[in-house]
């Protein structure tokens, strides 16, 4: 993980899991995190319309140029939704430094994939290290392994394990 991102994530810990996930996704400068940023809608590698820091959905307005503030608002809304979607399925106490990377992960792969994952089963069995290690398995999109997803999962895994050290 780049030192600047490590420092920014460490600074976000006091803000909780959503703050940690937000910094992971946006990076220290707002456009150098795990998602990058595009203010103009585009189709991602699997053909899904996407804007800002990876926001998807029917509310994307094609042809619109989004502002930095609009992108931040979309990310905050999306991460709050992720938290509501997955928190009920996590049955054990986990540190915010584990929960934050899980929010980032679910923001990327979707709550449905998380709910049926070995990763969640390991969390609920108390095997946090095993759960964090499972992140390494989620590096494919459209049937192809992507270096960017490999890098993302390594960073999410590293932060996920912070509470275990």
Swiss-Prot record:
Cell compartments where the protein resides: Host cell inner membrane
CDD domains: endolysin_R21-like
Active site, renumbered: 35, 44
GO terms for MF: lysozyme activity
First-level EC class: hydrolase
Keyword Membrane among record annotations: yes
Positions of transmembrane segments: 8-28
Presence of keyword Hydrolase: yes
Purpose: Signal-arrest-release (SAR) endolysin with lysozyme activity that degrades host peptidoglycans and participates with the pinholin and spanin proteins in the sequential events which lead to programmed host cell lysis releasing the mature viral particles. Once the pinholin has permeabilized the host cell membrane, the SAR-endolysin is released into the periplasm where it breaks down the peptidoglycan layer.
Protein family per UniProt: Belongs to the glycosyl hydrolase 24 family.
Name of protein: SAR-endolysin
Name of the gene this protein is made from: 15
């Amino acid at each position: 993980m780049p030192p600047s991102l490590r420092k920014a994530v460490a600074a976000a810990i006091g803000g909780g899991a959503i703050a940690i996930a937000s910094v992971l996704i946006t990076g220290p400068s707002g456009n150098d995190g795990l998602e990058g940023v595009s203010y103009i809608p585009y189709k991602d590698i699997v053909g899904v319309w996407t804007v800002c820091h990876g926001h998807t959905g029917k509310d994307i307005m094609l042809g619109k140029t989004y502002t930095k503030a609009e992108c931040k608002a979309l990310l905050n809304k999306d991460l709050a939704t992720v938290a509501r979607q997955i928190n009920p399925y996590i049955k054990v106490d986990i540190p915010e430094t584990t929960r934050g990377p899980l929010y980032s992960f679910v923001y990327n792969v979707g709550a449905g994939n998380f709910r049926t994952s070995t990763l969640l089963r390991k969390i609920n069995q108390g095997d946090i290290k095993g759960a964090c290690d499972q992140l390494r398995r989620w590096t494919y999109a459209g049937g192809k392994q992507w270096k960017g997803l490999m890098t993302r999962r390594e960073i999410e895994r590293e932060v996920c394990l912070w509470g275990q050290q």
